Swiss-Prot record:
Name of a matching Pfam family: AAA_31
Entry protein name: ParA family protein CT_582
Top-level taxon in the UniProt lineage: Bacteria
Stored CDD domains: ParAB_family
Family under the similarity heading: Belongs to the ParA family.
Coiled coil: none
Record SUPFAM superfamilies: P-loop containing nucleoside triphosphate hydrolases
UniProt signal peptide: none
Length: 255
């Protein structure tokens, strides 16, 4: 089982859309068994797959020892895609209950996921856009980190702090940076070269070749609670996310 934490230090980087479509592509087009984990209290991944966050338990109850992980997994479709939803309790889970007194609380998610490693080929975790307890726990539990950015100044500058954060974790836990993916891409953007150069300096050799172009069909798919492969299979967003999935699979197979 390969576990991937999808990260950014700033909102609006298509982190959740990337998580959703990577998982959906692996399940639908590569026949993989995929578990998506919404580890962000905003619960956008949950809503983007058509579930109401107020109606389901999140990993919070599992982290607190109140339920087993199998009890919070929700099937999304018959392709092999499952989801653990998010809820607002995630935002404060580390300061309540049994986690509050556990000095090794960051390790719990890794231990929990080890119990289902026979069940899935991939676990993909959508982390909050901040350097918080949830993000650290996800990175400790993961073997790989996928970093999301946009060709904007604040997004690219935020990568420097994220790089320092990840470096601190990888010094204690094995963690491979799978790559940096750029979304909302415009091939005619006048500052493209400057942004890509800064990313290469921050994460040398990790900028992925695939660019996710801006496409309204992604937002339209979210309204319907489905991936864009289902609502607009011929859209450029579908093409881009399938290419991204192929590129990531190549990297995973050649590590």
């Amino acid at each position: 089982m390969k576990t991937i934490a999808v990260n950014s230090f700033k909102g609006g980087t298509a982190k959740t859309s990337t998580t959703l479509h990577l998982g959906a592509a692996l399940a639908q087009y590569h026949k993989a068994r995929v578990l998506l984990i919404d580890f962000d209290a905003q619960a956008n991944l949950t809503a983007g797959l058509g579930l109401d966050p107020d109606c389901y338990d999140s990993l919070a109850v599992v982290l607190q020892g109140e339920k087993n992980i199998e009890e919070v997994i929700r099937p999304i479709d018959s392709s092999g895609l499952d989801l653990i939803p998010a809820d607002t309790w995630l935002e404060r889970v580390e300061v309540s209950g049994s986690l509050a007194a556990d000095r090794y609380s960051h390790e719990r998610l890794k231990i929990i996921l080890s119990k289902i490693e026979h069940r899935y080929d991939y676990v993909i975790i959508d982390t909050p856009p901040s350097l918080c307890w949830l993000t650290e726990s996800a990175l400790i539990a993961a073997q790989h980190a996928l970093i999301c950015a946009t060709p904007e100044f604040y997004s690219v500058k935020g990568l420097e702090r994220l790089a320092t954060f990840i470096q601190g974790i990888s010094s204690r836990h094995p963690l491979n940076i799978l790559g940096v993916t750029l979304s909302f891409w415009n091939y005619r953007g006048k500052n493209n070269a400057a942004f890509t150069e800064l990313i290469q300096k921050t994460f040398p050799g990790k900028l992925l070749n695939t660019r996710i172009r801006r496409d309204i069909t992604i937002s339209e798919a979210a309204i319907h609670g489905k991936p864009v492969f289902s609502t607009a299979p011929s859209a450029r967003a579908s093409e881009d996310y399938l290419k991204l999935t192929e590129e990531l699979l190549f990297l995973l197979r050649n590590i």
